[in-house]
């Protein structure tokens, strides 16, 4: 049980959909989106399709070194509508050929002579790769791009089309040490 927000909003109505669950509560909400180097890209990419369009926007892309989010953005770029919470994308991924369709889109990008892929595994890498000019576009986390763009005055701009929302959780082990105080701390942090 969480206390009401300062404005009186009940905790059950004060969290993003799905963040409080029976076992955990979300502590940060962020977006998987992409950004581009404004000095190295001619024109203004606006859609997730633009991320995959190496004819209009030539140059290497940086993508996460996992299927996580790559499959979703590949299908969105291939014309699959997102649906609420990405429901239509996930429905397509569950269907026969859905994963293959997404993987083929990624393979096309990574083997395209006008493009190619650099794979990243740490959140700081996408803005670093963009600023260094190693890639012209990169997928990543909106907060990392924001910090580089605003905090470091990096020449990058974010594109929100096709973004995926994600969150991290706090969880407590039932019957764990000092459970009562752990619950109080969790309530204060959220």
Indicate residue ranges for each PLM-predicted region.
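Hydrophobic residues within well-ordered alpha-helices
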Residues: 129-133, 172
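Alpha-helix initiation and capping sites
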Residues: 64, 96-100, 120-124, 132, ...
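Structured loop/turn residues at beta-strand edges in well-structured enzyme cores
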Residues: 46, 133, 154
């Amino acid at each position: 049980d969480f206390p009401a927000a300062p404005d009186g909003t009940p905790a059950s109505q004060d969290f993003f959909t799905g963040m409080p669950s029976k076992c955990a509560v979300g502590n940060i909400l962020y977006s998987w989106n992409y950004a581009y180097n404004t000095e190295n890209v001619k024109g203004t990419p606006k859609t997730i399709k633009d991320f995959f369009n190496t004819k209009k926007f030539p140059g290497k892309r940086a993508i996460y070194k996992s299927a996580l989010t790559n499959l979703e953005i590949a299908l969105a770029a291939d014309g699959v509508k997102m649906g609420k919470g990405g429901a239509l994308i996930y429905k397509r991924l569950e269907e026969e050929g859905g994963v293959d369709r997404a993987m083929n889109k990624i393979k096309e990008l990574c083997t395209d002579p006008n493009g190619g892929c650099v794979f990243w595994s740490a959140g700081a890498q996408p803005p670093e790769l963009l600023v260094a000019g190693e890639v012209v576009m990169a997928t990543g986390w909106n907060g990392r791009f924001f910090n580089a763009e605003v905090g470091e005055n990096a020449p990058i701009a974010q594109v929100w089309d096709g973004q995926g929302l994600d969150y991290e959780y706090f969880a407590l082990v039932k019957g764990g040490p000092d459970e009562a105080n752990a619950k109080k701390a969790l309530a204060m942090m959220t």
